[in-house]
Each structure stands twice: as structure tokens, then as C-alpha cells.
């Protein structure tokens, strides 16, 4: 578990495994399942899956009612596509989503889990009298060889700032190998948002604090505090009042068509205007996922929409609209919080002042589950170029 600079959360202490499915074996200990579980792992995968063997991560995820209720609502919303069908749960963890799907009438659910939590998932399935419907497969989705096609793929693959931990490629692998034409993917779409933020309380508490400690001048520590604060992305909760402009779209993902290669590196340019007079302390990132069918070719992606239209659409959703899970600052907090890229020094902006630049997100060469972020920001004649490593 790696330390987070600002709040003690380890980014790696979060997400879930990569997986695979198979036709229901006669027993939970089939040769295919054993082979998948024993397949050699890269060191970064071994550490990653080992972290998901600890109950604490699963407790945090399941206790996140925004997350868990959104998935349960999405399953019931799409019950007619699940009832009597074959479902694959990629990275099932404790098996809670698999149980939801089985209770929604799925004929068979392949619950694929690469960590040792698969053992407990199998016991949970049995304790709920669903072992005739839910087959727990212990192994990575990339390592299981099966002939069956599935009607639905469900997965809770999102990491901090959506893409940290890089589990999405496993879902796309399952899609390409096992999803039937016209099948359903839950969630279906994901959008990563970003906006400049102000957070004087946070900055003063971590940096300015050192100027006077119990009457002792410790300002010699201020440069170190600035470096420490802006070295890595911070996982913390901010509110809508901290956001200085309308958000812009960093990346939109259609899970029906997206290619894993697109995650290796991408750059987004932005140009926003400040809604108030305030210091910019950095940029915040958050995401939302939507549980829907394939996109209509005529549909606009979020990058084509005015941010105000995106927010208004979210606020007026009716019972027939797709279920949306949002981690935005103005919405109820989740265990994902928001991801903050702090500046070493704040930049003062006036109302309506233009803030522009680019953000580049790329997978780390040392570990594809890690992210490198390069931020370029220009406003009021000042330019900041800063690299962040999300380890």
C-alpha cells in the first residue's frame, strides 16, 4: 500500500482485478479454473491483486452507498436484458454485483476474480443459495479460456480519476472475447472531467502552517511543504464551492467501442474562464459513469456538449433515464473522492479571466497501472508546467 501525500489514502489501495469467464464447471475446482488461478503474474499485477485480498478495500467500496446503490439500480433498470441471460462480472470481489444479477433473474453469472477474495466470494454465493446460478472463477479474465458467449458484462472497474489502476483493459478484453453482438455493458459510458479549483484552507493548513508553529519560525520548511503538497495527486473531497470554472472533458469512453490502446497516452487542450476572484490552488478531476445501451451514432459525446448542458441533463433525469454514478464535487461524496493536482504556489485570477492550457495523461512505463500527468496552465501572463506521478 503506497502512501498518499495529502490524506493517507493509498491510490493503489482501491480498485479491483481483471477477470475472465467460463461455462459453469461441474465443480469450482475445474482444471481450467485452477490453470487460470495459477497463471504467472507480472510483479505489478501480483501486488495489485494481493491488495484486493484484504477486506478493508471491499468494506470501503460496499459501504459507499452512492456506488453500490447505483449498480443495484442499474441492474434493476436493465432487468429485462439480464433475466434469463448469461452475465459476466469482471472483477467480482466479494461477489455482491453477481448476487444482484442472479436475484434479477440471470440464468448464469460468471463471477471472475483474480485475488484470493474469490474463495470468500464462492462462500458468499453458497450462503445465499445461488451456487446453482453464480460460478466463481478464480483467475484473470485474460487467462481463462472458455467457449461461452455472454449477454451482459458488468464491472466496477473505475479507479481514482477514473483511470488509475488500469482495470478497464480487462473489461475491454472480456467484451472483445465473450460479449455477444448487441450485448449489454454496465457501465456503458464514462467521462473524466477537470476544472481549476481554489482551496485556501487546505493550502494554508499544509504550507502556510509552517510559518509560525507555536511561536516558532519554521518557514524553512515551507519550500519542502510546497514540494510535498504538489508532488503527487491528492485524493480528497472538495465541494462545488471550490470549483472555479465550468468543468471540461478530459476523456470520454464508450465501453462498446473504446480501444485499450487509447489509454496509453492522450492529451486534451482546455480553455475556461474563472467564475470568481480567487487564487487557483490547482486542478480537480472527477468522473461519472452511465449505465446505458450502445450509443446512437447521432448522439453527442460530452466533449461536444456545453458543460452547462451536461449538468442540466444530469439534474433533470427522470425514472426512464439511464442511471448515472457521479463523483462530482457538487454531488454526494463517494469513496473515490476527487483527485487534486496542487500547484506549488497559488495563482491569483480575476472573475472572467481566461485559464488555458493542456493536460496529458499517460500510463507509466514502469507499471501500466500507474499514471503520469503533465499539466500546462497559462493565465494572466503566468505559465505553469508541472508533472505529477500517480503511484
From Swiss-Prot:
It is an enzyme of class 2 (transferase). One of its GO terms (biological process) is chromatin remodeling. Keywords: Methyltransferase, S-adenosyl-L-methionine, Transferase. Gene3D superfamilies: Hnrnp arginine n-methyltransferase1, Vaccinia Virus protein VP39. S-adenosyl-L-methionine binds at residues 58, 67, 91, 113, 142. The keyword Oxidoreductase does not apply. The active site is at 156, 165. One of its GO terms (molecular function) is protein-arginine N-methyltransferase activity. Its EC number is 2.1.1.-. Belongs to the class I-like SAM-binding methyltransferase superfamily. Protein arginine N-methyltransferase family. PRMT6 subfamily. PANTHER family: PROTEIN ARGININE N-METHYLTRANSFERASE, PROTEIN ARGININE N-METHYLTRANSFERASE 6.1-RELATED. Arginine methyltransferase that can both catalyze the formation of omega-N monomethylarginine (MMA) and asymmetrical dimethylarginine (aDMA). This is Probable protein arginine N-methyltransferase 6.1. It comes from Oryza sativa subsp. japonica (Rice).
Amino acid at each position: 500500500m503506497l502512501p498518499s501525500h495529502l490524506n493517507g489514502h493509498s491510490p493503489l489501495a482501491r480498485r479491483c482485478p481483471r477477470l475472465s469467464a467460463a461455462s459453469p464447471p461441474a465443480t469450482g475446482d475445474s482444471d481450467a479454473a485452477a490453470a487460470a488461478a495459477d497463471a504467472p503474474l507480472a510483479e505489478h499485477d501480483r501486488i495489485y491483486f494481493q491488495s484486493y485480498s484484504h477486506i478493508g478495500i471491499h468494506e470501503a467500496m460496499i459501504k459507499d452507498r452512492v456506488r453500490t446503490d447505483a449498480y443495484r439500480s442499474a441492474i434493476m433498470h436493465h432487468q429485462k436484458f439480464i433475466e434469463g441471460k448469461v452475465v459476466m462480472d469482471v472483477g467480482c470481489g466479494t461477489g455482491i454485483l453477481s448476487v444482484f444479477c442472479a436475484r434479477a433473474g440471470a440464468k448464469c453469472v460468471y463471477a471472475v476474480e483474480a485475488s484470493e477474495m474469490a474463495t470468500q466470494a464462492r462462500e458468499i454465493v453458497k450462503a445465499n443459495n445461488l451456487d446453482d446460478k453464480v460460478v466463481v472463477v478464480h483467475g484473470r479474465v485474460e487467462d481463462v479460456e472458455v467457449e461461452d458467449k455472454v449477454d451482459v458484462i458488468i464491472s466496477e472497474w473505475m479507479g481514482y480519476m477514473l483511470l488509475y489502476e488500469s482495470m478497464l483493459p480487462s473489461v475491454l478484453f472480456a467484451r472483445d472475447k465473450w460479449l455477444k453482438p448487441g450485448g449489454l455493458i454496465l457501465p456503458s459510458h464514462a467521462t473524466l472531467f477537470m476544472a481549476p479549483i481554489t482551496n485556501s484552507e487546505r493550502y494554508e493548513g499544509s504550507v502556510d502552517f509552517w510559518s509560525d508553529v507555536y511561536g516558532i519560525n519554521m518557514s524553512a520548511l515551507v519550500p519542502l511543504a510546497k514540494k510535498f503538497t504538489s508532488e503527487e495527486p491528492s485524493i480528497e473531497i472538495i465541494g462545488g464551492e471550490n470549483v472555479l470554472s465550468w468543468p471540461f472533458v478530459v476523456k470520454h469512453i464508450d465501453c462498446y467501442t473504446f480501444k485499450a490502446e487509447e489509454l496509453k497516452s492522450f492529451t486534451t487542450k482546455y480553455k475556461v474562464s474563472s467564475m470568481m476572484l480567487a487564487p487557483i490552488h490547482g486542478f480537480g478531476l472527477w468522473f461519472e459513469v452511465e449505465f446505458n445501451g450502445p450509443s446512437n451514432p447521432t448522439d453527442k459525446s460530452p466533449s461536444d456538449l456545453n458543460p452547462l448542458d451536461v449538468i442540466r441533463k444530469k439534474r433533470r433525469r427522470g425514472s426512464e433515464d439511464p442511471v448515472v454514478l457521479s463523483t462530482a464535487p457538487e454531488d454526494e461524496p463517494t469513496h473515490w473522492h476527487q483527485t487534486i493536482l496542487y500547484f506549488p504556489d497559488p495563482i491569483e485570477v480575476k472573475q472572467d479571466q481566461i485559464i488555458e492550457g493542456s493536460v496529458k495523461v499517460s500510463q507509466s512505463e514502469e507499471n501500466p497501472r500507474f499514471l503520469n500527468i503533465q499539466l500546462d496552465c497559462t493565465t494572466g501572463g503566468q505559465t505553469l508546467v508541472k508533472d505529477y506521478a500517480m503511484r
